[in-house]
Amino acid sequence: MVICLLLCTPTDIFVVASPEVNETQEYVPVNVYHDTDVTRKKIVTAQFECYQKIMKDNDHNKIGPVCNRTWDGWLCWDDTEAGFTSEQYCPDYFQDFDPSELVTKICSDNGHWFLHPESNRTWTNYTRCNEHTNEGRMTAMNLFYLALIGHGLSLTSLLISLGIFFYFKSLSCQRITLHKNLFFSFVLNSVITIIWLTAVANNQELVQRNPTSCKVSQFIHLYLFGCNYFWMLCEGIYLHTLIVVAVFAEKQHLMWYYLLGWGFPLIPASIHAIARSYYYNDNCWISSNTSLLYIIHGPICAALLVNLFFLLNIVRVLITKLKVTHQAESSLYMKAVRATLILVPLLGIQYVLLPYKPEGRVSSEIYDYIMHILMHYQGLLVATIFCFFNGEVQGVLRRHWNQYRIQFGSTFAHSDAMRSASYTASSITEVQGCYSIDSHTEHLNGKGAPLDIETSILKSENPFT
């Protein structure tokens, strides 16, 4: 008995103490991702509300036998007519419970709740709640590796892009400086996400210990997540100021952009951390089942909407200028805006889809895959659109590649010509030694001719002649 009590979690102890817990449930799910205190509070709250409801509800006009309202340890059940089966959705107390599945409780023909034949106690069928646990675990692992691959690809592409921007000095300008900061924020976000997924979210023992370090890492993760979107906002503000406000003025003070991109996301991240510690202090703040996350998501959605407004206004101004003046400069700015205009909806579509998660198991799984691709492959998307598809970057890379080919080809042709001339000279010298040709012929064949050949080759306009 002592060993049993030591092994049971507080949630398990509470459930066992309840009068109608299903003794036939062989597996009691252990929630490793939520704080057990939070789970226990949910059950206690549901039990309190159930007993209040039982006392307040009036008795219905009973015609025939009826199973009385009751609390079974996890859910509250209303009065049910004899011979009927009552249903409701599975509770969300545990990580491996699927809230889209149904719990059933049978009211027998004699007006009593169904008794399990083995235990002879009232029994509620919760078996469907974790029926797909193994499939859910497989899906969770697939999503885990999908996220790791996405951030790995994002990290690689972003570092290559930053290398291009720093190496080629001809690309240096204020807009590229903003690109560098945007890319760097995505690099940091990918690094902290990989650390979070491998060292925290995948470590049940660490989550159970709930050290302060894992909450600090979650704070940094949410802060960098906000930096991504506010640097996107900086891109939109810069283009709007450059094209609409300053009328193609070139220089702007970047200090305000640094404050907005790196400084402002600290505010919602700090407010979220304080609120989370007081109102939903689960282990490592790993749960997403709290409205406190709107403290983070709200400013991000506002930044996306403001950015979209700026970009649409920029397009309107540029189209007007192109119709009136047909300036080539306006056309160039339109190309610069197009990349940002494409990227903002792509980065923001996850927040459009977020409130509309479907209820079904299969449709919910498809939704999870789509959301993971949208969230964890953003760095790859940003690097591709802002760097690899950038006309300026492509032009610089093409010019340097052509210069390298010409330089390499010239060096190769020069060394080939030298080898050819050396081979000709050595061959004639061998002939000279074998046949003892006179000095006049030796001058013509052994020295003069190869020298002329070598000179003509080295002076040729075609390096591959």
Swiss-Prot record:
It is found in: Cell membrane. Residues 167-177, 241-254, 317-331, 390-465 are cytoplasmic. One of its GO terms (molecular function) is calcitonin gene-related peptide receptor activity. One of its GO terms (biological process) is angiogenesis. The chain crosses the membrane at residues 142-166, 178-200, 212-240, 255-275, 292-316, 332-353, 369-389. May function as G protein-coupled receptor for calcitonin-gene-related peptides and adrenomedullin. Specificity may be modulated by accessory proteins. May activate cAMP-dependent pathway. This is Calcitonin gene-related peptide type 1 receptor. It comes from Oncorhynchus gorbuscha.
